[in-house]
């Protein structure tokens, strides 16, 4: 599910939507694997609705860090070449730069305190730290349940080349409980 309005590129005729997290939120035992398309951005053909590509920010999300942020579309030079980019500060505390035509991961870095990953690999997949999953006794993790950012509208300035986004630096205790879920 989506929370907010997506973004549209009229030249590529693609719609970009941030997708919510899988359920149940804090017990991933009942939903093994990456939980494809959740906590992701999807690019859809505006006429047919056909999936063009997707990028998953938080595979097997057990911290409620869905990708509800509005994807920001910019055209600018990237490594000496003019590119169509999608930029997004995700709730998981990482900032991402993607090619908005192909979904290719170009860059990512931490923008707020986080304690659950050592960084991102060459494909943008988080390098998770063992023991940061929710537990029956509670696990203290940054960012919090509210994320490093949330549904607040971001803004990009072509003058400064910067993305402006509200940031939260707080942690939460994540508790796992047994749930029946279908």
Placement of each model-derived feature along the sequence:
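Extracytoplasmic/lumenal domain signature
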Residues: 28-67, 74-82, 94-140, 171-182
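Repeat-blade elements of multi-bladed beta-propeller folds
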Residues: 1-30, 40, 66-90, 150-155, ...
């Amino acid at each position: 599910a989506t929370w907010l309005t997506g973004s549209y590129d009229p030249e590529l005729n693609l719609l970009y939507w941030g997708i919510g997290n899988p359920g149940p939120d804090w017990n991933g035992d009942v939903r093994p694997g990456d939980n494809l398309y959740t906590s992701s951005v999807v690019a859809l053909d505006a006429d047919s609705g056909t999936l063009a590509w997707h990028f998953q920010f938080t595979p097997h999300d057990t911290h409620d860090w869905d990708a509800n942020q509005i994807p920001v579309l910019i055209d600018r030079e990237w490594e000496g070449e003019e590119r169509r980019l999608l930029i997004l500060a995700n709730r998981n505390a990482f900032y991402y730069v993607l090619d908005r035509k192909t979904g290719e991961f170009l860059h990512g870095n931490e923008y707020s305190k986080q304690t659950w990953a050592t960084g991102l690999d060459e494909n943008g997949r988080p390098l998770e730290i063992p023991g940061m999953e929710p537990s029956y006794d509670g696990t203290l993790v940054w960012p919090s349940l509210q994320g490093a950012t949330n549904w607040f509208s971001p803004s990009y300035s072509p003058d400064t080349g910067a993305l402006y986004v509200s940031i939260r630096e707080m942690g939460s205790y994540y508790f796992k409980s047994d749930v029946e879920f279908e």
